[in-house]
């Protein structure tokens, strides 16, 4: 090791110590120090079988229970491409407006590591499945500072995932689970177009939404379905790679730290080494320098034929794609839906709920869409949330919710208060029920067999008793604090178990109080 390199390393260690002593690093940019960043995203594809074998893709099975001879590199086994992986890669590439390579091929990336039993990884180094394209960021939806920005794609390639290495500290053993080996991955490489940390985080979140929406991947960073490598440089200097970041918060923190570390190096006139670094939750640490970089000795894989695609393939895939997330959001926030942006984005991120919403809107008749929106997003989802339950459309189908809204607003046979109570019963019931059946079982419909005059008399009696019992509230109302009447209405609704409309009580209280 050269004397100069030793000095550089010592200087960088001093810088790291100063960074640790300083306050927690933020993500703000520093004037005069331009951030330049690119991403590599490794995305596990949602296929039933692995990339080059008939083993099931499995993430929850016991270790080494979902493997084939090829997955563990036994001699004499041959790879055979899973066409479903190719189909999903094409869906993603076309959605990003990438150029499809009509003659792509596979290569061997040679390195030795226990989680790669073949001694090489099958990837697409020379002729990837797609190149070019972009993902558009928009300040309206993505929270970036620029109005709009296209993040360009360098390339998209198919490759194998590796096995999973587990280091067991207490007995000093290294255990390898090959269930993950040969699971199909897409590696997507961007151009170094990111200039702020916010843009990086926005891109990753938008990419997650896209792959989930297209059913290409589960989109989870926490489980490793998407793994992120970040390439960072400041003022056009040497590029540093930070590998295997597992969440957007990790990406933001690691990128913020590395950006400021490089600024400190530049201020101190210390060389920034071109290297790979790891993030430990507090700082980035060197793991491999350019001098230690492996020679992967890429060679074409002679056991796999060239993938030859028809010249119309991009058009064919495009015709099979659904409307993409940004277009869906724009549609949902406009008439006739008029959904709030946050709710529209929630629907796009949860495609099964989006389908539920469309079915609900198709089912309602003579009911304002705004009312349907309010009941779905606030009352229905709220009922599941209050009971710590995930949304389950089997508990209350779109047609059942439409029927409930009709009973509230058209037939007026159940009050809003009673309907909210009914929702609580429906979401916790062991079996689904028809709306009328549930109303009868829980006695939540409006009183039947009672004349209008009888109801008026009951309302008068209840309101009079409540007014007499709450002189302080009456005084506040007469002094101009008109919202205090809501307390009285709440007491009346409780007295009638929600079976009489709050509007009736409101009108009667106002008449009796004289407001």
Curated annotation (Swiss-Prot):
Residues forming coiled coils: none
PANTHER family reported for this sequence: GLUTAMYL-TRNA GLN AMIDOTRANSFERASE SUBUNIT B MITOCHONDRIAL AND PROKARYOTIC PET112-RELATED (PTHR11659), GLUTAMYL-TRNA(GLN) AMIDOTRANSFERASE SUBUNIT B, MITOCHONDRIAL (PTHR11659:SF0)
UniProt name for this protein: Glutamyl-tRNA(Gln) amidotransferase subunit B, mitochondrial
Enzyme Commission number: 6.3.5.-
Species per Swiss-Prot/TrEMBL record: Meyerozyma guilliermondii (strain ATCC 6260 / CBS 566 / DSM 6381 / JCM 1539 / NBRC 10279 / NRRL Y-324)
InterPro entries on file: Asn/Gln-tRNA_amidoTrfase_suB/E (IPR017959), Asn/Gln-tRNA_Trfase_suB/E_cat (IPR006075), Asn/Gln_amidotransferase (IPR018027), Asn/Gln_tRNA_amidoTrase-B-like (IPR003789), GatB (IPR004413), GatB_Yqey_C_2 (IPR023168), Gln-tRNA_amidoTrfase_suB_CS (IPR017958), Gln_synth/guanido_kin_cat_dom (IPR014746)
Swiss-Prot/TrEMBL GO biological process terms: glutaminyl-tRNAGln biosynthesis via transamidation; mitochondrial translation
Subunit structure: Subunit of the heterotrimeric GatFAB amidotransferase (AdT) complex, composed of A, B and F subunits.
GO annotation, cellular component aspect: glutamyl-tRNA(Gln) amidotransferase complex; mitochondrion
Additional note from the record: This protein may be expected to contain an N-terminal transit peptide but none has been predicted.
Record-linked Gene3D superfamilies: 1.10.10.410
Family per similarity comment: Belongs to the GatB/GatE family. GatB subfamily.
Keyword Magnesium in record: no
GO molecular function: ATP binding; glutaminyl-tRNA synthase (glutamine-hydrolyzing) activity
Keyword ATP-binding on entry: yes
Organism domain of life: Eukaryota
Entry function: Allows the formation of correctly charged Gln-tRNA(Gln) through the transamidation of misacylated Glu-tRNA(Gln) in the mitochondria. The reaction takes place in the presence of glutamine and ATP through an activated gamma-phospho-Glu-tRNA(Gln).
Catalytic activity: L-glutamyl-tRNA(Gln) + L-glutamine + ATP + H2O = L-glutaminyl-tRNA(Gln) + L-glutamate + ADP + phosphate + H(+)
């Amino acid at each position: 090791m050269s004397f100069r390199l030793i000095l550089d390393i010592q200087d960088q260690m001093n810088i790291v110590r100063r960074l640790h002593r300083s306050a927690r690093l933020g993500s703000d940019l520093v004037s005069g120090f331009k951030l330049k960043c690119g991403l590599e995203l490794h995305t596990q594809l949602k296929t039933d079988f692995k990339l080059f074998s008939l083993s099931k893709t499995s993430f929850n099975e016991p270790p080494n229970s979902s493997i084939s001879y090829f997955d563990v590199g036994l001699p004499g086994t041959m790879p055979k491409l899973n066409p479903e992986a190719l189909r999903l890669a094409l869906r993603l590439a076309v959605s990003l407006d990438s150029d499809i390579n009509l003659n792509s091929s596979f290569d061997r990336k040679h390195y030795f590591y226990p989680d790669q039993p073949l001694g090489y990884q099958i990837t697409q180094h020379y002729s990837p499945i797609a190149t070019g394209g972009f993902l558009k960021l928009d300040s309206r939806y993505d929270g970036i500072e620029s109005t709009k920005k296209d993040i360009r794609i360098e390339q998209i390639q198919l490759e194998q995932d590796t096995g999973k290495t587990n280091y067991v500290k207490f007995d000093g053993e290294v255990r390898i689970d090959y269930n993950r080996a040969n699971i199909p991955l897409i590696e997507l490489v961007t151009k170094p177009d990111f200039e702020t940390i916010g843009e990086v985080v926005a891109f990753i979140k938008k990419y997650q939404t896209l792959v989930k929406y297209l059913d290409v991947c589960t989109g989870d960073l926490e489980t490793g379905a998407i793994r992120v490598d970040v390439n960072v440089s400041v003022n056009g200097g040497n590029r540093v790679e930070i590998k295997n970041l597992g969440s957007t918060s990790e990406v933001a923190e690691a990128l913020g730290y590395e950006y400021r570390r490089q600024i400190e190096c530049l201020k101190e006139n210390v060389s920034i080494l071109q290297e790979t670094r790891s993030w430990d939750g507090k700082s980035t640490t060197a793991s491999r320098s350019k001098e230690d970089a492996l020679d992967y000795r890429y060679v074409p894989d002679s056991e796999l034929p060239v993938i030859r695609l028809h010249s119309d393939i991009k058009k064919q895939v495009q015709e099979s794609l659904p409307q993409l997330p940004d277009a869906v959001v724009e549609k949902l926030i406009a008439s006739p839906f008029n959904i709030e942006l946050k709710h529209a984005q929630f629907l796009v991120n949860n495609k099964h709920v989006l389908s539920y919403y469309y079915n609900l809107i198709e089912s309602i008749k003579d009911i304002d869409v705004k009312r349907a929106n309010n009941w779905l997003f606030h009352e229905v989802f709220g009922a599941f949330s209050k009971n710590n339950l995930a949304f389950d459309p089997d508990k209350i189908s779109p047609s059942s919710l439409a029927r409930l809204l009709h009973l509230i607003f058209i037939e007026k046979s159940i009050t809003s208060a009673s309907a909210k109570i009914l929702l609580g019963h429906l979401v916790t019931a062991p079996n689904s029920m028809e709306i009328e059946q549930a109303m009868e079982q829980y006695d939540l419909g409006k009183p039947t067999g009672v004349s209008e005059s009888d109801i008026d008399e009951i309302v008068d009696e209840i309101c009079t008793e409540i007014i007499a019992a709450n002189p302080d509230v009456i005084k506040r109302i007469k002094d101009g604090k008109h919202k205090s009447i809501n307390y009285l209405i709440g007491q009346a609704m409780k007295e009638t178990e929600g079976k009489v409309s709050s509007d009736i009580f409101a009108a009667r209280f106002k008449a009796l109080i004289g407001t």
